[in-house]
């Protein structure tokens, strides 16, 4: 299974989140899953890719020219696609992935997640998105999402169970295994 991970590339992210990302990457490789990610260095992006690489797994990186120009291209992907811009990157990530996992991150992570959710709502795909919420990182966002859903504005997306929220790494693994077996 190709698992897309959206996450922070900031080196200011806490060590706890880096450890979780590395552990998840290691688990992915041991289970025979392929990481699909943004192909850049730093923060959780490096942690998850290093976890996969150190365990002998496969990595698909999809990186736009503008990030390469900043010297942020990772050497870890076993397959690397260079694209023209962020929109093309998101499109390819959706195409190459079977499930999406959202680790803690900032505006780029949110952009990727909402793009994926919106694409699901309009029928471009019916793939699962899992919001990983360690240490209640996404609590404020979850309150707003709950308000959106209660107002009926996100019905199409959640009706099919395409958005899951998990608080632990074990919970994340369980959701992926369930999705794989469906």
Predicted regions mapped to residue ranges:
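A cross-family phosphate/adenosyl-ligand binding-site feature
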Residues: 1-96, 135-181
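Active-site/ligand-binding-proximal alpha/beta "capping" segment
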Residues: 88-124, 130, 182
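A generic structural signal for well-ordered coil/turn residues at beta-strand boundaries
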Residues: 125-126, 159
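Short, glycine/charged-rich beta-strand-loop motifs at protein surfaces that mediate ligand recognition
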Residues: 129-135
């Amino acid at each position: 299974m190709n698992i897309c991970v959206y996450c922070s590339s900031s080196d200011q992210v806490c060590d706890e989140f880096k450890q979780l990302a590395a552990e998840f990457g290691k688990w992915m490789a041991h289970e025979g899953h392929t990481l699909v990610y943004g192909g850049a260095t730093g923060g959780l992006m490096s942690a998850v890719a290093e976890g996969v690489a150190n365990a002998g797994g496969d990595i698909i990186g999809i990186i736009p020219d503008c990030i390469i120009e900043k010297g942020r291209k990772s050497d870890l992907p076993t397959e690397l696609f260079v694209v023209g811009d962020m929109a093309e990157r998101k499109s390819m990530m959706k195409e190459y992935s079977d499930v999406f996992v959202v680790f803690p991150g900032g505006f780029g992570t949110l952009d990727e997640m909402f793009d994926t959710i919106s694409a699901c709502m309009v029928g471009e795909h019916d793939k699962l998105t899992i919001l990983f919420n360690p240490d209640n990182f996404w609590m404020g966002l979850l309150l707003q999402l709950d308000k959106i859903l209660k107002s009926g504005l996100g019905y199409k997306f959640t009706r099919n169970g395409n958005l899951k929220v998990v608080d632990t790494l074990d919970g994340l693994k369980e959701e992926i295994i369930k999705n794989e077996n469906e």
